[in-house]
From Swiss-Prot:
GO cellular component term, pick one: extracellular matrix
GO MF: metalloendopeptidase activity; zinc ion binding
Gene3D superfamilies: Collagenase (Catalytic Domain), Hemopexin-like domain
Cofactor(s) the record lists: Zn(2+); Ca(2+)
Protein name from the UniProt record: Matrix metalloproteinase-19
CDD domains, A to Z: HX, ZnMc_MMP
Residues covered by region (Disordered): 473-500
Membrane topology term: Lipid-anchor; GPI-anchor
EC number in record: 3.4.24.-
Domain of life: Eukaryota
Length: 527
């Protein structure tokens, strides 16, 4: 780090065991304080750290760790910094030891899904450990957790290595960072697959305890200054008779309230039921990195969804997400769609197929749907929402219709030629959408077009759709003759049927900052 080199040797007169720390050790200390939120990098000037800022950061860390408070680097402080811990920051900037709150879910009945397991534990032991991790919280707060084995889940748990392409905060190998999690309503929990994950022994890293800690984050709890609390940032080791610390209990109850004793027995019987995967036999599984899509939509939760055949996947900056059966996310929705469009104006998603339309709010079908949609030609090619006039555009062949969801629209003047409004766009597009960057995109075959503010095709387009899907060098290894993703046997992936396809599975967070991937060499298991 260049900004450290100018002052590192002069600013930090730190010693350990009577000897002065070298530049590399000092840099590691500063990196730690910066990484976990004890020290803030100056906004202006690369060498503007003040000695008092670093001293205060060390004092805060020592206080939060239950160490003698000196503001100096000593043996105990150095040892504490080397302990395995959670990857989230410690926003300790107040004197109170009270729990920290990061937000909460707007519902209390949550689903979770286990995507893979480490090589050191069997599937039954992993499942038992994770179920117990959730149960610690549901035993003291009015929360229920239900495991699902396919489709969307509120909380998604997975194991990643150093080179995971779909996890923005990559892990560092054995020791140091053990796991990290998203805040509420994002829902990703990632574990370092290189740790020696164990259960029922003092050796290795106890999966049950670490998972319970990360679930606490996923429910909205920050780190606790009580070193004996589950939500303390540093791993305290295996505890065979573990119970939540009073600070953990107070924090979760501040978010969700107390669990009612009279409903406890009833909920205990139902909270860990599992939901079986969809059993209907789907069509062939597509490769997201080849071929055209049936529809594309910037949908609920700000995620980009691509549809092909009976499957849907999310598109992230790190590549295509997992393939789900469409009906697993939107119950009652068929595959092989003609078009789809999400309207931020009404928060409704409309899907078109033949002469019918399906309407969903989030992932729930509206009453009375599907219904016939005879006001335009059947078998549409594409649809998009245009934020400029808050209208929905429907495309078929070389023409388009402009439809107002909330008002009676006179469609007798349509269709109008696509080229009169969207210059340079091909006829019969397979998909279209307005995206987060405010631009309009059209897709056809293996190409896509971006339009500028004048609704003309931008320079450099069309481009290959693999660029849009962020495939490129991130594309999983494929069989050169079939294009199928090549499986193997390093990790265990859950919730899919045995197949030679789809060995890359990803559930991105709502921010697309933490999504999950499994490298090549995976064994796919039926749920």
């Amino acid at each position: 780090m260049d900004w450290q080199q100018l002052w590192l040797a002069f600013l930090l007169p730190m010693t350990v065991s009577g000897r002065a720390l070298g530049p590399t050790e000092k840099e590691a200390v500063l990196d730690y304080l910066l990484q976990y939120g004890y020290l803030q990098k100056p906004l202006e000037g690369a060498d503007d750290f003040r000695l008092e800022d670093i001293t205060e950061a060390l004092r805060t860390f020592q206080e939060a760790s239950g160490l003698p408070i000196s503001g100096q680097m000593d043996d105990a402080t150095r040892a504490r910094m080397k302990q395995p811990r959670c990857g989230l920051e410690d926003p300790f900037n107040q004197k109170s030891l009270k729990y920290l709150l990061l937000g909460h879910w707007r519902k209390k009945n949550l689903t979770f899904r286990i995507f893979n397991v480490p090589s050191t534990l069997s599937l039954p032991r992993v499942r038992a450990a994770l179920h117990q991790a959730f149960k610690y919280w549901s035993s003291v707060a009015p929360l229920t957790f239900r495991e699902v084995k396919a489709g969307w889940a509120d909380i998604r748990l997975s194991f990643h290595g150093r080179q995971s392409l779909y996890c923005s905060n990559t892990f560092d190998g054995p020791g140091k960072v053990l796991a990290h999690a998203d805040i509420p309503e994002l829902g990703s929990i990632h574990f370092d697959k290189d740790e020696l994950w164990t259960e029922g022994t003092y050796q290795g890293v106890n999966l049950r305890i670490i998972a319970a800690h990360e679930v606490g984050h996923a429910l909205g709890l920050g780190h606790s200054r009580y070193t004996q609390a589950l939500m303390a940032p540093v791993y305290a080791g295996y505890q065979p008779f573990f119970k939540l610390h009073p600070d953990d209990v107070a924090g979760i109850q501040a978010l969700y309230g107390k669990r009612s004793p009279e409903t406890r027995d009833e909920e205990e019987e139902t909270e860990m039921l599992t939901v079986s995967p969809v059993t209907a036999k789907p069509g062939p599984m597509p490769n997201p990195c080849s071929g055209e899509v049936d529809a594309m939509v910037l949908g609920p939760r700000g995620k980009t969804y691509a549809f092909k055949g009976d499957y849907v996947w999310t598109v992230t900056d790190s590549g295509p997400g997992p393939l789900f059966q469409i009906s697993a996310l939107w119950e009652g929705l068929p595959g092989n769609l003609d078009a789809a469009v999400y309207s931020p104006r009404t928060r409704r998603t409309h899907f078109f197929k033949g002469n019918k339309v399906w309407r969903y709010v989030d992932f729930k079908m509206s009453p009375g749907f599907p219904m016939k949609f005879n006001r335009v030609e059947p078998n549409l090619d594409a649809a998009l929402y245009w934020p400029v006039n808050q209208k929905v555009f429907l495309f078929k062949g070389s023409g388009y219709w402009q439809w107002d969801e909330l008002a009676r629209t006179d469609l007798s003047r349509y269709p109008k030629p696509i080229k009169e409004l969207f210059t340079g766009v091909p006829d019969r597009p397979s998909a279209a959408m307005s995206w987060q960057d405010g631009q309009v995109y059209f897709f056809k075959g293996k190409e896509y077009w971006r339009l500028n503010q004048q609704l003309r095709v931008a320079k450099g387009y069309p481009r290959n759709t693999t660029h849009w899907m962020h495939c490129g060098s991130q594309t999983p290894d494929t069989n050169s003759s079939t294009g199928d993703v090549t499986p193997s046997t390093t990790d265990t992936v859950l919730g899919t049927t045995p197949s030679t396809m789809g060995s890359t599975l990803d559930i991105p967070s709502a921010t697309d900052s933490a999504s999950l991937s499994f490298s090549a060499n995976v064994t796919l298991l039926g749920a």
